[in-house]
């Protein structure tokens, strides 16, 4: 549904160049909620503005719903008819609402339909339908100043849906909201994704947003995508920065002659007493140094940091037992020799 290839954006000012996007390749499948996460300055907002060509990319291509927007844009400063038509399939939700204070809630939602030349009757019908969809049917005649932050964002979402888009872009839509309101807006986005079949690309710096509603995610740093995939794939990837950030665990070894493991479990494995089975089977004392568990996409997923007595070479068999149970195991304090042994064990398990 959304594909970027070699997407590059360079800003030039007073003889200086700043590269905001550096060859970004991204693919968002139809009907999924895709989160792009990263710190301030990572290039997230530049990415989403290039996806709908609010910013013209310096290089690379953007394809949305089968249309190559970069080809449609041409070289002129203004958008042509074909590009405007392609953009009509894209809705945008902003961080700061951008509602017109002199217009009622209904009139704000009707604004895109006015621009499209729809009749007053059609505009009114569509706006009221959308306000009901976002839970604001009783606020149609209110003004933005009379609304809470969460209600304003709901109006922004309704306005973004006025043109019946196939894709919804969300640029930090919850960052100015309190935690409870954030949860309600995220649930609304997920409901719209399911009810309308919307493809949602959202930009955020909050890990909880990714955990709450995202099917897939990408981590950006300094204008590049450093990791991407489904949340499940990322959690199963050894050494994944995004997985570690989604489920952070801490704790250091109590001595040099100890093995520290990060254990990632999900699905059925999350409900099995694997650690106690390991302790009984091999008659070893296991220390739990840290743990985090949550529900992602309806599945229980968690990470645990445990300590085993003895060096890694002494624990190859117990580690193999854990991997046989379908768990992802990362050895935190392994030496180069232990790393080689660990890699060999993974290969054996894959045969």
UniProtKB/Swiss-Prot annotation:
Which EC number applies? Answer: 7.4.2.11
GO MF: ABC-type D-methionine transporter activity; ATP binding; ATP hydrolysis activity
ABC transporter domain location: 2-247
Per its UniProt record, what SUPFAM superfamilies does this chain match?
ACT-like, P-loop containing nucleoside triphosphate hydrolases
Q: What PROSITE patterns does the record tag this protein with?
A: ABC_TRANSPORTER_1, ABC_TRANSPORTER_2, METN
Question: Which compartments does it reside in?
Answer: Cell membrane
EC category name: translocase
Q: Cellular component per GO? A: plasma membrane
Coiled-coil residue spans: none
Q: Name the UniProt key words of this record, in alphabetical order.
A: Amino-acid transport, ATP-binding, Cell membrane, Membrane, Nucleotide-binding, Translocase, Transport
Which residues take part in binding ATP? 38-45
Topology of this chain in the membrane? Peripheral membrane protein
- Could you confirm whether the keyword Nucleotide-binding appears in this record? yes
The UniProt catalytic activity note for this protein reads:
L-methionine(out) + ATP + H2O = L-methionine(in) + ADP + phosphate + H(+); D-methionine(out) + ATP + H2O = D-methionine(in) + ADP + phosphate + H(+)
Q: What does this protein do?
A: Part of the ABC transporter complex MetNIQ involved in methionine import. Responsible for energy coupling to the transport system.
What is the similarity comment for this entry? Belongs to the ABC transporter superfamily. Methionine importer (TC 3.A.1.24) family.
User: What is the annotated quaternary arrangement, including any partners?
Assistant: The complex is composed of two ATP-binding proteins (MetN), two transmembrane proteins (MetI) and a solute-binding protein (MetQ).
Its name, as the record gives it, is: Methionine import ATP-binding protein MetN
Species name: Streptomyces coelicolor (strain ATCC BAA-471 / A3(2) / M145)
Q: Which gene encodes it?
A: metN
């Amino acid at each position: 549904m959304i594909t970027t290839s070699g997407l590059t954006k360079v800003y030039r000012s007073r003889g200086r160049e700043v590269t905001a996007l550096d060859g970004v390749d991204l693919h968002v499948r139809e009907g999924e909620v895709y989160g792009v996460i990263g710190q301030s300055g990572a290039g997230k907002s530049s990415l989403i503005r290039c996806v709908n060509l609010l910013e013209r990319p310096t290089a690379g291509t953007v394809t949305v719903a089968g249309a190559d927007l970069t080809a449609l844009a041409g070289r002129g400063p203004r958008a042509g008819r074909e590009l405007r038509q392609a953009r009509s399939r894209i809705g945008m939700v902003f961080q700061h609402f951008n509602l017109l204070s002199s217009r009622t809630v209904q009139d704000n939602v009707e604004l895109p339909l006015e621009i499209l030349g729809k009749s007053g009757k059609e505009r009114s019908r569509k706006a009221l339908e959308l306000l009901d969809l976002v839970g604001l049917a009783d606020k149609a005649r209110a003004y933005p100043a009379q609304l809470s932050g969460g209600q304003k964002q709901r109006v922004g979402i309704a306005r973004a849906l006025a043109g019946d888009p196939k894709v919804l872009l969300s640029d930090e839509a919850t960052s100015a909201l309190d935690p409870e309101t954030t949860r309600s807006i995220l649930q609304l986005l997920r409901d719209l994704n399911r009810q309308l079949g919307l493809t949602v690309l959202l930009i955020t710096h909050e890990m909880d947003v990714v955990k709450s509603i995202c099917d897939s995610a990408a981590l950006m740093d300094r204008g590049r995508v450093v990791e991407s995939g489904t949340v499940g794939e990322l959690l199963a990837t050894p050494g994944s920065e995004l997985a570690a950030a989604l489920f952070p665990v801490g704790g250091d070894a109590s001595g040099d002659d100890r093995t520290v493991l990060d254990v990632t479990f999900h699905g059925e494995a999350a409900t099995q007493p694997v650690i106690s089975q390991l302790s009984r089977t091999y008659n070893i004392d296991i220390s739990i140094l840290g743990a985090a568990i949550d529900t992602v996409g309806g599945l229980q997923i968690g990470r645990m940091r445990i300590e085993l007595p003895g060096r890694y070479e002494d624990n190859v068999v117990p580690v193999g037992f854990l991997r046989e149970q379908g768990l992802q195991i990362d050895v935190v304090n392994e030496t180069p020799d232990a790393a080689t042994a660990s890699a060999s064990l993974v290969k054996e398990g894959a045969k």
